[in-house]
């Protein structure tokens, strides 16, 4: 299995992050989210978002590198869920290029995000995942040790389709 390095994202990484965000959504959510929604997701739109996120550290962003090439990213910070304690963090995003799926890059990003959440004083961490995304559920539950936070389903609209998301949680340590 390859070894990946992880570091905080820099402004120069915004384009690579936007490329990865679009490519992974189009690969992972094909058949789950309508094609017109996936096709409307452009690198240009994502680039503006990620430039601002990196500039303001909202959320905090890490990138995974294979040699010197950005091949994945994670965004994390305090939980955005209403009514949660300040000691609860959230993985806002964790995406790796399809060519690097199941090779350890996601775990390297999770480990880096977990360290960042610990530094922020978080003791618990949550994330939301599409209930129909079996691959993501398998990664977070089996590889990263998350458990389903029942009952925590919410419905999110993706174009004309409404999909259920499930919150997962675990201790930071």
Short names for language-model regions:
Residues 20, 120, 143-144:
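Structural motif
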Residues 136:
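Helix-turn-helix
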Residues 17:
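Hydrophobic pocket/interface hotspot
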Residues 4, 8-11, 22-32, 36-99, ...:
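Acetyl-CoA-dependent GNAT
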Residues 117-128:
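Conserved GNAT acetyl-CoA-binding A-motif
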Residues 97-99, 103, 131-132:
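Active-site acidic-Proline motif in GNAT/NAT acetyltransferases
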Residues 84, 126-129, 141-164:
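Conserved catalytic-core motifs of GNAT/GCN5-like acyltransferases
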């Amino acid at each position: 299995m390859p070894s990946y390095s992880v570091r905080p994202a820099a402004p120069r990484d915004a384009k690579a992050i936007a490329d990865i965000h679009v490519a992974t959504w189009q690969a992972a959510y094909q058949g789950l989210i309508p094609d017109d929604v996936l096709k409307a997701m452009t690198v240009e739109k994502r680039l503006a978002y990620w430039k601002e996120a990196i500039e303001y550290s909202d959320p905090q962003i890490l990138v995974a590198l294979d040699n010197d090439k950005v091949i994945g990213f994670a965004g994390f910070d305090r939980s955005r869920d209403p009514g949660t304690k300040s000691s609860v963090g959230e993985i806002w995003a964790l995406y790796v290029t399809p060519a690097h799926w199941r090779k350890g890059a996601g775990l390297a990003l999770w480990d880096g995000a977990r360290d960042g959440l610990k530094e922020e004083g978080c003791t618990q961490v949550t994330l939301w995942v599409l209930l129909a995304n079996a691959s993501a559920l398998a990664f977070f539950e089996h590889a990263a040790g998350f458990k389903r936070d029942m009952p925590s389903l919410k419905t999110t609209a993706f174009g004309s389709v409404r999909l259920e998301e499930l919150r997962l949680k675990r201790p930071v340590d």
